[in-house]
Amino acid sequence: MTLQPAILSEPDTPAPAEALTRVSPMMEQYHEIKAANPGLLLFYRMGDFYELFFEDAEIAARALGITLTKRGKHKGQDIPMCGVPVERSDDYLHRLIALGHRVAVCEQTEDPAAARARKSVVRRDVVRLITPGTLTEDTLLDARTNNYLLAIARVRGSTGGDRLGLAWIDISTAEFIVTECALGELAATLARINPNEAIVTDALYSDPELGPLLRELAAVTPLTRDVFDSATAERRLCDYFAVATMDGLAAMSRLEATAAAACITYVERTQLGQKPPLSPPSREIAGATMAIDPATRANLELTRTLAGERRGSLLDAIDCTVTAAGSRLLAQRLAAPLTDAGAIAHRLDAVEAFVADPILRDGLRATLRAAPDLARALARLSVGRGGPRDLAALRDGLLAADAALAQLAAATSLPQEILAAMAALRRPSRQLADEFSRALADELPLQKRDGGFVRANYQAALDETRALRDASRQVVAAMQARYADAAGVKGLKIRHNNVLGYFVEVTAQHGERLMAAPMNATFIHRQTLAGQVRFTTAELGEIEAKIANAGERALGLELEIFEKLTAMVIAATDDLRAAAQAFATLDVTLALAKLAIDDNYVRPEVDGSLSFAIEGGRHPVVEQALKRDGQPFIANACDLSPGPAQSSGQIWLITGPNMAGKSTFLRQNALIALLAQIGAFVPAARARIGIVDRLFSRVGAADDLARGRSTFMVEMVETAVILNQASERALVILDEIGRGTATFDGLSIAWAAIEHLHESNRCRALFATHYHELTALSGKLPRVFNATVRVKEWHGEVVFLHEVMPGSADRSYGIQVAKLAGLPPSVIARAKTVLAKLEANDRGQSARALADDLPLFALTARAPAEALPPTEAEQLIAALQALHPDELTPREALDALYALKAKLPK
């Protein structure tokens, strides 16, 4: 969703005077804090609840489905209010952030008792600004997905060619990337990055061309122009990364620097002045990754299905990773396949090494399975939101690094990518792991404020303080026995309440003894009740103070230790970050090796040619689904390589019936190319693929009512993108172009599109169609090759063989598919009659003449069986269904078998 334009103002912004008149002190404070944080939902701490007021309450109540009530009045009007319990606030925050809202968390910063003593409202301050793109908490993040904040800056071209600078950050993993693109490339780039929040200028947000595209993102935050000030961008970047000049950072354009500076400015504001330690910006080189437009990503279901689910996507099918960081890296690679054959070969070498060594592969996967998410633990500690378990995660990660290095050291001839990962794993000092092992207890609380996370015997002062805290009962019990003996009062008790603290209590008859000399020198009278008299002593007061402070002092000492350990972590940030990346790289490589072994994938040959030769290709997702059902996948070859037209062609024109597997064949070849270029083995018997620089898919379509576009219009827009942008190195798959309009219109469009692909784009393409007339183009265009999907007719039934072979189909078998779908028999019978008449007249008869010639279609009272007699196959199936094998004698079974054989056609 899109949020209101907002500036994350500094906390000293004054509130409007009119908002502060005639309100209670609490509401006055609320208005001041709210005015300093416009555009954010204010979670205002009130005891054990966070409360929201006015419009914030109405928004939150709708979004969370909680009760909207009221609290007092403001200017004579009821104040809308809703609230959520503090202890469950993370759940509510997660839901609000997922909907694109931003939240300011306002906490009580003093004890209410201190406020009462001052006769004033409790002091409160905003301690966190939570936005969709600046999350670090595990409870708010998806462990397997990056959480990107994206900044977009624009410069107007003198001839109308606008350029855009993009910078995106994941502060939960410290990634920071910049690039520059043309306006026409923005949609594909946004689809690849998939940001959780985008920041832009007010002007860009309101731009008639860019605005609609931006508003399709999950959350957009318009900011004032000063955040995107190019004149101060380099200084802001240098200040953030503590370098004297931009020479200390990666080379980047002024436009990229502007976007990068906007990112870090927004991060600093949302983190209330803290500077999360980010990796220096890395510059993404234009053309280094395969360009994939949004429609193609959606159609191929790379990371999400068309229904928005991860399950059933390509990512779900190939994700064998055992760590969250590995899963994130695999998704990144799938979103941005490489176009450098050398870099792809390095990745494939690493996968092949693990394919060839099952013992090393399985052992390393077991080691990585125990490795925590180092990157996100490091990020939380860096911004002050970490806990003891994050320190333990780093300890366990370093121990896992040692184990992994020991396993890898036993291997020989490791490829470059694995050697680089080993070097990164060696970087962190092992003193960190040793220190954390000595310092951290076995059982750790979630929050550092809970205490109890430092191991006994780590610090003497802490042990002494804990002993006093934990031994308080024994100390008081010993004092009680000593006082009872000294006073000669066996019933003397030491008790405690919140008013008097610790006190000595005796019955009324013994009270006079303690108030008389010499006992009154020790026991000081405090209170007389009906049946008891209460006293205190100087010693008891001292012990009470020690006991009361012991818990606080113990926690304070633990927090000091926590800060010391955290400082050690921050000092080693770069080394720990490198180790975290190495874990992710190893995990992805191992996962792809396991996938190759489990599903019989092969190493593709990827080079700089224009080849595309697949033998025994399979669809990775469909194959897995069929395997679960115990069914085989029919493999098919595809050769789009340049060569003689009679053997193949760079444009395959595929005809065949519905349900035969044309769309699956199209998609599987696109996915094989994509898998090859992320450095994965592929589902085929053999594959040689020349680098694909752009991947286009126009498969299936739905209307876009929000933009006022029909299904056919969506289809034409997607086709236009392909015809205008596909290069010689592109791979294009097109399914049934022109089907959404009149037959001859659609045929004409499809015909012209094929000619354009052949003559102008000159790319590799798969074109599936039901316009059989198009097959004539293979005789006219030398690089067009006809292919068809085999079917077999058997006694009036159609059997889909799912085999792609040279040739063309003369029928689409639509009526047979309609019958399989369950259309009423009377409709099927009527359709056959109409089809026969159409075919007899070769479609040359006018619609009016055809309607006059055919008898009127009318439903009768005839039974469906009379309308369409069962086929021989249906009769055989019915006979088999009527048999009950467990109830037949051997003789009856034999007779039944002969009877069935007799029903078979001669």
Swiss-Prot record:
InterPro entries to which the protein is assigned, alphabetical: DNA_mismatch_repair_MutS, DNA_mismatch_repair_MutS-lik_N, DNA_mismatch_repair_MutS/MSH, DNA_mismatch_repair_MutS_C, DNA_mismatch_repair_MutS_clamp, DNA_mismatch_repair_MutS_core, DNA_mismatch_repair_MutS_N, DNA_mismatch_repair_MutS_sf
UniProt GO molecular function: ATP binding; ATP-dependent DNA damage sensor activity; damaged DNA binding; mismatched DNA binding
Top-level taxon in the UniProt lineage: Bacteria
Keyword Nuclease attributed: no
Protein residues bound to ATP: 656-663
One Gene Ontology term from the biological process aspect of the record: mismatch repair
Family under the similarity heading: Belongs to the DNA mismatch repair MutS family.
Name of the molecule in the record: DNA mismatch repair protein MutS
